[in-house]
Amino acid sequence: MNENEYDNFDDLDDLLDEDPTKLDEQSPMMCKRRFCVHDSENKEKNAESKDSDGVQVANESEEDPELKEMMVDLQNEFANLMKNNGNENNVKTEDFNKLISALEEAAKVPRQQMEQGSSSLKSNSTDKGTLNGSNPGFKNIVSNTLDRLKENGNKVDTSLAEETKESQRSGQNNNIDDILSQLLDQMVASGGKESAENQFDLKDGEMDDAITKILDQMTSKEVLYEPMKEMRSEFGVWFQENGENEEHKEKIGTYKRQFNIVDEIVNIYELKDYDELKHKDRVTELLDELEQLGDSPIRSANSPLKHGNEEEELMKMLEIDGNDPNLGNLDKELTDGCKQQ
């Protein structure tokens, strides 16, 4: 055994011989001597750990790129859908934008803040979705909402495209389309039954009421005012250019009467106290007389007297009498036709 080993054993013996009460007094010096190196190493490790945690927290507070992209898509889809529905939805659009902003802020919450707010989040702090500042459930909600919005937007676009094609193919204006739609609704409602199989089983007199309502709509100011006003203006131009021509001499009296009737109808619609119920009988009489006078020299596309099968059918409907015995056959034909559809 060499000299150093003896020295070590001597130190050990001295330590064991010491009074235990004095160990506490010597322990600080021993710690300072034996563990100062370890202490400095621990400090360096702790500093590195803090720096790492700071970077992690900073990363956690950043937005999830995937979620951010979903938010932008969600906002764009909603904006497109609102365009198809008109300007009256501006308020809804603003509210939706506020909701998007709130969701974006929620997605930015770092994990440390979430852990401080809820013990349940502490237990799930290692979850991948939480580390990214959001959880998978939150992403799923945004994703599902975006899918629904896209689906609804596609339905709106398809519906608008079909309506545009139908309008171009039929050559009818929106007013007439609305009338025909309301017309069908009235005939369906007149059945008085909720069953789809029996809704066209019309009772006696109900078809008469439906046709009366149809005629009332066709003679309404909403439908006829603009076409009649345009026709009156074109009549004035026509008389200035053709009133003295010999070729129109035989019919010039008829044309003047037509002009007077159109002018009277327009004047009725422009009355300050105009009332649909009050003036509809007079308007109907004038339209009947106008139809009986025959063709007009006016060829306006919006003219109620334009030539063609559509106008002839309209005028025939205006001639229908509620007491006409043939009305019963019309009732049966319409009912059978609706059932077949």
Swiss-Prot record:
Induction: By oleic acid (at protein level). Residues 113-141 have a biased composition (Polar residues). Its main location: cytoplasm. The modification Cysteine methyl ester is found at C338. It is a lipid-anchor. One of its GO terms (cellular component) is peroxisomal membrane. Pfam families: Pex19. The keyword Transmembrane does not apply. Residues 1-26, 39-66, 109-141, 293-312, 318-341 are annotated as: Disordered. It is found in: Cytoplasm; Peroxisome membrane; Endoplasmic reticulum membrane. Keywords: Cytoplasm, Endoplasmic reticulum, Lipoprotein, Membrane, Methylation, Peroxisome, Peroxisome biogenesis, Phosphoprotein, Prenylation. Residues 339-341 form a propeptide. One of its GO terms (biological process) is protein import into peroxisome membrane. The keyword rRNA-binding does not apply. PANTHER family: PEROXISOMAL BIOGENESIS FACTOR 19 (PTHR12774:SF2). Required for proper post-translational import and stabilization of peroxisomal membrane proteins (PMPs). Acts as a cytosolic import receptor for PMPs and delivers them to the docking factor PEX3 at the peroxisomal membrane for subsequent insertion into the membrane. Acts as a chaperone in stabilizing or maintaining PMPs in the lipid bilayer. Directs PEX17, a peripheral component of the peroxisomal matrix protein translocation machinery, to peroxisomes. Stabilizes VPS1, a protein required for peroxisomal fission, at the peroxisomal membrane. Interacts (farnesylated) with PEX3; farnesylation is required for this interaction. Interacts with PEX2, PEX5, PEX10, PEX11, PEX12, PEX13, PEX14, PEX17, PEX22, PEX25, PEX30 and PEX32; the interaction requires well-defined PEX19-binding sites within the peroxisomal membrane protein targeting signal (mPTS) of the PMPs and is independent on the presence of PEX3. Interacts with VPS1. This is Peroxisomal membrane protein import receptor PEX19.
